[in-house]
Amino acid sequence: MAKIHMVLQGKGGVGKSMIAATIAQYKAGKGQKPLCIDTDPVNATFEGYKALNVRRLNIMDGDDINTRNFDALVEMIASAEGDVIIDNGASSFVPLSHYLISNQVPALLQDMGHELVVHTVVTGGQALVDTVSGFAQLASQFPAECLFVVWLNPYWGPIEHEGKGFEQLKAYTANKGRVSAIIQIPALKEETYGRDFAEMLQDRRTFDEALADSALTIMTRQRLKIVKTQLFAQLENAAVL
């Protein structure tokens, strides 16, 4: 059974492509060859990772789903031998979610012997409320055969609202049964770990590419190695992956 990992969140610039790239690198490190697809109609960030062989497929036509291209996406999934990782843009979040649900795509994938895993992001700072409600919306609308992984991204601040952490928020407690795993992206010290990781992401480089680059200082590579270890250890513990 292949797992179809789809990164969905209606807020832009919250780390969706980073998550898709991290999953792809984790899978590759296990000797797997996931099919990576970037469907973001505006920012093809995931496609920028040359080492991951990401295919670009624009599933939007204006504000609507391009059904012919979406059909092509389903065909790609159907013929995939391993897992599939799909990065999706904020602008296509609403139409894509509606299209997946109204066309009963999660059930279709299950009938093919595949499993749909939706990865969504919750961030601290100004986007906290929007990203939490985006998660709640997905969890309440998607059918039971769909699994969820929530990534907590503290880049813009701690993930808490009125003194409550994510796991105490109503959006989570009401949908707890839907969540297979919570991945905590490390809170990185801005001037060291944070800068190193941000530069690696801006360059669309994988951890392995950065760690093999002798032009980077020894300590920069050491810090990136620690971030990689922290992320991959959590993915290792997430049974859904």
Curated annotation (Swiss-Prot):
Keywords carried by this UniProt record: Conjugation, Plasmid
Residues annotated as transmembrane: none
CDD domains: TraL
InterPro entries hit by this protein: CobQ/CobB/MinD/ParA_Nub-bd_dom, P-loop_NTPase
Keyword Ribonucleoprotein: no
Highest taxon in the source lineage: Bacteria
Pfam families named among the record's database cross-references: CbiA
SUPFAM superfamilies for this protein: P-loop containing nucleoside triphosphate hydrolases (SSF52540)
Family the UniProt entry places it in: To plasmid IncP-alpha RP4 TraL.
NCBIfam families for this protein: PRK13886.1
Name of the molecule in the record: Protein TraL
Organism: Escherichia coli
Lineage: Bacteria, Pseudomonadati, Pseudomonadota, Gammaproteobacteria, Enterobacterales
